[in-house]
Amino acid sequence: MKLIDVVSARKIIETKATEKVEFNLAYKFAKLIKLTNDDEEFYNKSQREIFEQYAKRDDKGNVLPDENGRYQFDTDKIATVESELRKLATTEVAIPESLKFTVEELTPLKFSVEEVMIFSSLIKDNDDEK
């Protein structure tokens, strides 16, 4: 599973975490969050390092944020930043099959189509078993 999918799926789980669900599903959510804590920390740290490495700087070497406080990049560095971020996002992360979900387990919850697409790497589709 790709690192970006893990990070995105964690965000979805966190939005569902306050809903009352069957114990088995809540337990699986909790185990998955716990298992992927280091992955999310690695992603956030690495992303920050990429931004810091290529960000525009003033003459004293300090990062020059834009008016919204976000990182800015010189035009000639944007492709490199995008490439580095893509490489980070596509880093493979192993998720045990036992922590993947069946459609039936997730049916009691409400998901947007976008959330289902993000979460799909963690779903054991019945069609996969045929």
Which role fits each region the language model picked out?
Residues 2-56:
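N-terminal interaction modules that seed assembly of large macromolecular complexes
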